[in-house]
Amino acid sequence: MLRPATPLAVLLFAAFGLLTLATISTPIIKQIPLSSFEIKDVGDLSFGVFGYCTSSGCSPIEIGYDTSAFSDKINSDFDIPRATRSTLSSILIVHPVAALITLINFVLAIVAHFHSPSHSARYLLILFIVSFVDFIVCLLCFLVDVLLFIPHLSWGSYIVVAATILVAFCGLVTCAMRRTLVNRKANRKRIAENAEMSGENYYNRQAQTAPVTQVTGPQPTVPMISGANGGGDKLPEFTTFEKKDDRSEERIPLTSVSPIERSPATLVNDSTPPNFMDGAPSRSPSTTPVGRDQYGNPLPPQDGYAMRVGPQNERLNSRGRGGMPPGGYRGRGGFPGPGRGGGPPQNGRGGYGPPGRGRGGYGPPPRGYGGPGPRGGRGPPPQGYQGGPDRRPSPGAPYGPGPGVGTYGPSQPSPYANRQQSPGPQFAAPGYGNPEQPGPQYSAYNPRRVSLPRAESPPPLPGIDDGMPGPAVELDASPANRGVGQYGIRDSDSDVAGMLAMQQARVPDPDRGNDANGHSQEGPNDVYVPPRQAWNQGFVGSTPGLAPPTARGPTRPISEAVTATVASDYYEDVDPRFAEPSAAADKRPPPISMQSPPASNSYDDIPNRARSPAESENSNFTSISQRGINPRWNSANAPMPPPVAGVYAGGGGGGNVVPRRPVNRPGAGPADGSDLFLNSNPDFQLPGRGGNMPRAAGPR
């Protein structure tokens, strides 16, 4: 293995070999003379370190020569006198000494190949000193040879010169090795003393910026196992690692919306109207997702029909004279509110029971100058439905549960006893009243608040509810679902108007309280009569009692009638602010002999499931979009068509005309044949009764 001391060893080995040859010269090896010359009469003469040789023989091996034995001729050939040459001949002994020192130096060079001596400046210093001494001895040998044998030097003396030169080079190599080591150590020392060069400052800065490692508590030590191979090691028993936690403590979803960011319209659409009133199941065919606040709690429920609470836009004549007190939507069993012209309190509908509960009888006559309210329909009326046409669009919220829905027959404690009632006309069928619609008021139509598309129920035609009512008709009692018709839908305008939502595969509310046979669970005494049969029977009994057209006069002042019929034909196609009053049309009473044919459809015991208008027996249309558009809805002052033969004032008819319930509008005159625009679909027939108030023609 090559080391820095390898060249030194090679040089020393060569020098040692040369010195060895010079030492074993003549007389040991006669062929290696240090000096030789030829003398006449004597022959060849050669000299070595330990003697000389002549042609006749060699001297014994000894240190120094006896020059007196030579003739004067031999001594005269040398430059130094004979006595001096005899003294110098004894100094030839330095040749073996030089060879020995060279050998020692060679051994030291071999040792310098090891790591420890080679990295020791002191050892290299010793090697250098030995090399220097060796050089001096070799040089002395050469000088002795020159002084003693000049001018007859032989090649033996020259190899001593070569050995001296090699030893000199070995001294230089040793010096270089030591100098290199010393410089290396000096550099390390300087680097160690300089903090910037050694990186101490860098590591100090790193230590200052390094994160503090988490120090764990004292850990229990593991007992050392003693035995043949037992013994404690110096390695750490526990190692602590720090793991970065990437998980966030934030648990609030990024998509959550706090209640502060909700607008009033958003609150209305996101909140679910109460599906239950006093434990009553919901009758709404569709549901709205429940809104939640930023903590995941459900928002408080809104009013019964998902109408926003706040300042409302009251329509004209909402509480004035001639108007009707505010009531609910067109629902069943309505009663008037606290306006002028109210009725008995709200308590659902029943048979002919007391006015406090059930749908029987009329309330006390209106107080003050209030006009007739709308007929008690199938749902809560818009706010401000007070004897005159409501000039606001229909609410955009889905058809909610109709308050005040009870059963026909004797008055029973109903689970809907505390539900709000919808307003009814002044002269309505038994059980229809004019309740007040307390609580939140309905505001103007806002397209952004519409949650579900639905078909609009046309408002009642004017001049139908003004007539005197006929005698009360006892309704037939037949067991059926409590006010639920075909496919789990009530026979009301609000439920039929929601057919578009049913076409979108919306199923009925599963919370309806029906048993396995489809019958109501309200009580054993609850009976049900299909609404349309009740209307037909009511009209049969009440129509003959109507006064002749000539004997019927206006029951209210002309100005009041005009006020009630200014926008009576408004079908939410024009904003109420831009509706123009229409001229009074021909105020003709309906024929006396008109009677309603019996109902041809029965909706009893139909399984509750999603229904489609294509399953209607009398409808030729499968979608609301297939119905034609009334070509005269934009005509402002077009007269109404004459009455159709065989059609009674409520919109029913004989012959090929499909019967339907009359469209009722408070404060309007008797109906004519122009209200047959919905005869093509019996599901959109609206309730109505004859009145004594003339109607005015207007746009539809």
Curated annotation (Swiss-Prot):
Organism: Neurospora crassa (strain ATCC 24698 / 74-OR23-1A / CBS 708.71 / DSM 1257 / FGSC 987)
Topological category with respect to the lipid bilayer: Multi-pass membrane protein
Biased composition (Low complexity): 657-671
Pfam family of the protein (one): SUR7
The protein's name in its UniProt record: pH-response regulator protein palI/prr-5
Entry annotated with the keyword Membrane: yes
Any one GO CC term of the record: growing cell tip
Classification via InterPro entries: pH-response_reg_palI/RIM9, SUR7/Rim9-like_fungi
Residue intervals on the Extracellular side: 30-90, 145-152
Region annotation (Disordered) ranges: 226-491, 507-560, 573-700
Compositionally biased tracts (Gly residues): 320-378
Gene: prr-5
Polar residues bias: start-end ranges: 414-424, 593-603, 615-637
Role played: Required for the proteolytic cleavage of the transcription factor pacc-1 in response to alkaline ambient pH.
Cytoplasmic side: 1-8, 112-123, 174-700
Main location: membrane
Keywords: Cell membrane, Membrane, Transmembrane, Transmembrane helix
Coiled coil location: none
Presence of the UniProt keyword Ubl conjugation in the record: no
Highest taxon of source: Eukaryota
Biased segments, Basic and acidic residues type: 234-252
Transmembrane segments: 9-29, 91-111, 124-144, 153-173
Subcellular location: Cell membrane
